[in-house]
């Protein structure tokens, strides 16, 4: 569960967080873990190049063909400026995202799991989703990922079925205000 003294914030990636991004990436690679909601972070050992690539997804004129607009957020623990999670919001869905990725992808640093960070991120990104005009939010997880399944349900998710590779599909009827 999230400890009360762990104040968190969602911020967009910037040079200020290059060292934390590199350490976050290393934590996942050392654990041979999936890096959901991180965009192409796995492919980049140069954080400046990662940031430049991530920014391409924020504007129609630089968006790679076949991709969707997306906003990347870092979840920073204020007490030590540590990157504990990442969450990506896709502004709309293409065919692939309708059955596998959804509007939101997220991950929590392996060494920081089971502290409520995923639930906090999912709850606190919903006002941003609402500002994009999303009336429903699709969030997916593998059927073997019990932690994500519970996180999604805790945040108003409703089971909508199973798609490819045992991906469970959940929708929230509307983004909730978090005030």
Please report, for each region that a protein language model flagged, where it lies by residue.
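A short, well-structured alpha-helix characteristic of acyl/acetyltransferase catalytic modules
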Residues: 1-53
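Acetyl-CoA-dependent GNAT
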Residues: 42-99
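A short, internal acetyl-CoA/4′-phosphopantetheine-binding micro-motif in the GNAT/acyltransferase core
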Residues: 76, 90, 103-114
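Conserved acetyl-CoA-binding loop-helix of GNAT-fold acetyltransferases
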Residues: 106, 114-127, 150, 154
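Conserved GNAT acetyl-CoA-binding A-motif
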Residues: 131-140
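Conserved catalytic-core motifs of GNAT/GCN5-like acyltransferases
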Residues: 140-141, 158-169
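Conserved active-site alpha-helix within GNAT-family acetyltransferase domains
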Residues: 144-159
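Single conserved hydrophobic/aromatic residue that forms the stacking wall/gate
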Residues: 170-179
């Amino acid at each position: 569960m999230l400890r009360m003294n762990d104040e968190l914030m969602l911020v967009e990636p910037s040079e200020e967080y290059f060292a934390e991004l590199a350490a976050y990436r290393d934590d996942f690679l050392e654990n041979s873990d999936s890096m959901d909601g991180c965009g192409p972070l796995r492919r980049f050992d140069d954080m400046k190049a990662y940031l430049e690539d991530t920014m391409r997804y924020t504007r129609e004129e630089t968006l790679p063909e076949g991709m969707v607009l997306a906003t990347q957020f870092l979840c920073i623990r204020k007490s030590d400026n540590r990157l504990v999670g990442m969450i990506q919001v896709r502004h709309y869905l293409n065919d692939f995202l309708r059955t596998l990725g959804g509007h939101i992808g997220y991950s929590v640093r392996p060494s920081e799991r089971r502290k409520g960070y995923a639930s906090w991120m999912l709850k606190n990104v919903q006002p941003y989703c609402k500002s994009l005009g999303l009336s429903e939010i699709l969030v997916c997880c593998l059927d073997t990922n019990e932690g994500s399944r519970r996180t999604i349900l805790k945040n108003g998710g409703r089971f909508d079925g199973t798609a490819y590779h045992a991906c469970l599909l959940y929708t929230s009827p509307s983004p909730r205000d978090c005030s």
